[in-house]
Amino acid sequence: MRLCSLTTALILLSTDGTHAAEDYCFGCHTVMEGTSLVFKDDVHYHKGLSCADCHGGDPKINDMNLSKTPETGFRRRATRETVPAYCGRCHSDPNFMAQVNPKLRVDQLALYNKSVHGRQLAAGRTEASECVDCHGVHNIRAVSDPCSPVSPAQVTETCAKCHVATAEAFRESPHGHEFTYDRRPGCVTCHASHATESATTAMLTGKDAVCVRCHKAGSDGAKTAAGIAQVLTRLETADPNAKEALARLRVAVHTFDMDAVQRAADSATVSPEAVRK
């Protein structure tokens, strides 16, 4: 992360003053909480966007009260519930995105709304992850930037902010070591980014399973996945209401170690004999 801090400093020193010269938002917010300094490191800033593109208002009026009115289109700070739609105003607009970054997909909001995180947020669970939890707020970086929290090098740590035990199990697993060596993104390789779904045994086995993308039928990896799926199915069958036990077992799945998975199953509230049948 020290390298990221150094990169930030260099960008701030090299950034031209075009935005600041035309935008009175920077005058106050540099002094108040430093938001504008952080924003100068943001991918949106470097694409020519300003505070007003998200927040509305008139940045050319040198009066805070006059610049932030309904007449100037000022928008209040987004809440957790409204952040996805807030970001989606631009990121779901193909015409706008074609001008800013035609390489970016414009279905990310639609995917998020259908995902487990999106459904939880829509159901009123405000602790569910939304855009800024993963991407940041005023210092958002391109995914290709190694300092971005959603870059291949950082994404596992970003997911770990919520999924602590699962990320720890993954880091020490064969996949964790291999992905680090190959500089491949961790969690999102299997779980996707915006279209994340609740984990099921279908991810482990079957023609549409995640595991078969890399592990051919009959390989050691495929056999391990099938064995893990069997243990999960047995516990689900033995006690469908054993939510805590199943949660612990799904964490253990990320070790990709049959012994660790079986130990987690044996520690379930139901009898080990029932799980092993």
Predicted feature residues:
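Short sequence/structural segments immediately N-terminal
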Residues: 16-277
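Bacterial N-terminal signal peptides
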Residues: 2-14
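Accessible peptide chain termini
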Residues: 1-2, 45
